Amino acid sequence: MTTTTVTPTPLAEKTALAPKAELHIHIEGSLEPELIFALAERNGVKLAYDSIDALRAAYAFTDLQSFLDIYYAGASVLLHEQDFYDMTMAYVERCLADNVIHSEIFFDPQTHTERGVPIATVVAGIERALADAEKRGMTSKLILCFLRHLSEEDALATFEEALPLFEQYKHRLIGVGLDSSERGHPPSKFERVFAKARALGLKLVAHAGEEGPPSYIYEALDLLKVDRVDHGVRSIEDPALVTRLADSRVALTVCPLSNLKLCVFDDLTKHTLKDLLDRGVAVTVNSDDPAYFGGYVNANYFATIDALKLNDAEVYTIIRNSFEASFVTPEQRSELIAKLDAHWHPSGPH
């Protein structure tokens, strides 16, 4: 991984040590090149790259699709429950190092079922790792994402296959999402499967307004009726939409280094996060696919603080937003925010 490094300022150091939540992380996107090669060897999978360095050199993306092509190739090494456990535990270690005390994690079952790996195998491995993480003080939820470049019929079949798992793991597997290639695949394409998930009382999220237009965010809100919008950075192009997001407190799970790496913005100083924050939108900072985009949660905070010249109060608000927007009980939310406040305002609020 080519890590984005910024010399920590006192605010960055305070942020690094602060308890945080991550709300936009694709577990398959945390698969580092070293682990890809280790799993390939363990499982006898032939990779298109002859070395870790050659694979890392291929991480030169021009847009979302060029990233997705290599992302799916990397996931090909995941075959057995232990593989999903190992991948998830590696992410957990990164969270613990970054003081991420709560994470809501996406996984893409269709990436695996099309290779003959049952959803139950995927979830069992991830769940076992997340149960171990809880013993170390990190809580988590799991969100099943549909691949939007595939058909809604495929998504509906995936949802039906996963129904027993939503019951078996109801403490953890609490929602559905929508990811993969955004262009040409509007949220409206998945209205039926989201209605089924909503009828079960599941939480709903969707990627919208990363490469897609503001109209995709409206569709996510009005047709899918999402609880959170993933990315959403192009909402700034529609003032009425920004006002609606701010008034409704529907959070945006923003991923700054991902946006930079995928050329959503050609420079982090041009990122819309601060403008959205200034207008009252509940923005959060997340890593997306950290193994591919050069940074886990703290690296995203450091780069964003530096590029957008965020101040103490703004960073506190962003971190607090991550807890406010999380899918936990009100009691858990209060506990999480209390931990943040104890760190951020050790002598009490000013």
From Swiss-Prot:
<comment type="similarity">
    <text>Belongs to the metallo-dependent hydrolases superfamily. Adenosine and AMP deaminases family. Adenine deaminase type 2 subfamily.</text>
</comment>
<keyword id="KW-0546">Nucleotide metabolism</keyword>
<feature type="binding site">
    <location>
        <position position="288"/>
    </location>
    <ligand>
        <name>Zn(2+)</name>
    </ligand>
</feature>
<dbReference type="GO" id="GO:0009117">
    <property type="term" value="P:nucleotide metabolic process"/>
</dbReference>
<dbReference type="InterPro" id="IPR006330">
    <property type="entry name" value="Ado/ade_deaminase"/>
</dbReference>
<dbReference type="GO" id="GO:0006146">
    <property type="term" value="P:adenine catabolic process"/>
</dbReference>
<dbReference type="InterPro" id="IPR032466">
    <property type="entry name" value="Metal_Hydrolase"/>
</dbReference>
<keyword id="KW-0479">Metal-binding</keyword>
<keyword id="KW-0378">Hydrolase</keyword>
<dbReference type="InterPro" id="IPR028892">
    <property type="entry name" value="ADE"/>
</dbReference>
<dbReference type="GO" id="GO:0000034">
    <property type="term" value="F:adenine deaminase activity"/>
</dbReference>
<keyword id="KW-0862">Zinc</keyword>
<dbReference type="GO" id="GO:0005829">
    <property type="term" value="C:cytosol"/>
</dbReference>
<comment type="function">
    <text>Catalyzes the hydrolytic deamination of adenine to hypoxanthine. Plays an important role in the purine salvage pathway and in nitrogen catabolism.</text>
</comment>
<dbReference type="Pfam" id="PF00962">
    <property type="entry name" value="A_deaminase"/>
</dbReference>
<feature type="binding site">
    <location>
        <position position="207"/>
    </location>
    <ligand>
        <name>Zn(2+)</name>
    </ligand>
</feature>
<dbReference type="InterPro" id="IPR001365">
    <property type="entry name" value="A_deaminase_dom"/>
</dbReference>
<feature type="site" description="Important for catalytic activity">
    <location>
        <position position="231"/>
    </location>
</feature>
<feature type="active site" description="Proton donor">
    <location>
        <position position="210"/>
    </location>
</feature>
<feature type="binding site">
    <location>
        <position position="289"/>
    </location>
    <ligand>
        <name>substrate</name>
    </ligand>
</feature>
<protein>
    <recommendedName>
        <fullName>Adenine deaminase</fullName>
        <ecNumber>3.5.4.2</ecNumber>
    </recommendedName>
</protein>
<dbReference type="GO" id="GO:0008270">
    <property type="term" value="F:zinc ion binding"/>
</dbReference>
<dbReference type="GO" id="GO:0043103">
    <property type="term" value="P:hypoxanthine salvage"/>
</dbReference>
<feature type="binding site">
    <location>
        <position position="26"/>
    </location>
    <ligand>
        <name>Zn(2+)</name>
    </ligand>
</feature>
<feature type="binding site">
    <location>
        <position position="24"/>
    </location>
    <ligand>
        <name>Zn(2+)</name>
    </ligand>
</feature>
